[in-house]
């Protein structure tokens, strides 16, 4: 089954992301809602196996699924807006579900806390 990731942030919702998500679900896809990549001019933006499509409308779903969409932007991580960034605070943005502890753990979450708990207060301050 095809997994389609679509942002559920406020801007994506205002641009019609819910309707696009419903259209993908109606086409038999598994829809995962997550955080935005921050490319708001491409919302609603759908990601399928790392490939981006946007901005989409519900009527675009069939062409995305059959590979004929003119709204393909290529690999999202290679898009010029994303590729030139060094994401620190937002390293997980667009890659995880914002409220998912499972996604947080799978992408290295808690590692800083584990490291801190293994050190004394003085060692933490010294770092």
PLM-predicted stretches and their roles:
Residues 1-127:
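Feature of Fe-S/electron-transfer and energy-metabolism proteins
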């Amino acid at each position: 089954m095809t997994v389609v990731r679509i942002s559920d942030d406020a801007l994506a919702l205002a641009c019609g992301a819910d309707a696009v998500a419903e259209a993908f679900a109606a086409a038999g896809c598994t829809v995962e809602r997550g955080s935005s990549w921050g490319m708001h001019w491409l919302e609603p933006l759908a990601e399928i196996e790392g490939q981006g499509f946007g901005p989409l409308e519900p009527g675009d779903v069939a062409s995305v699924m059959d590979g004929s969409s003119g709204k393909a932007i290529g690999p999202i991580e290679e898009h010029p807006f994303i590729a030139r960034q060094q994401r620190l605070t937002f390293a997980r943005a667009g890659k995880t579900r914002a409220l998912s502890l499972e996604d947080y753990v799978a992408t290295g979450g808690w590692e800083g806390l584990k490291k801190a708990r293994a050190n004394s207060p003085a060692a933490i301050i010294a770092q």
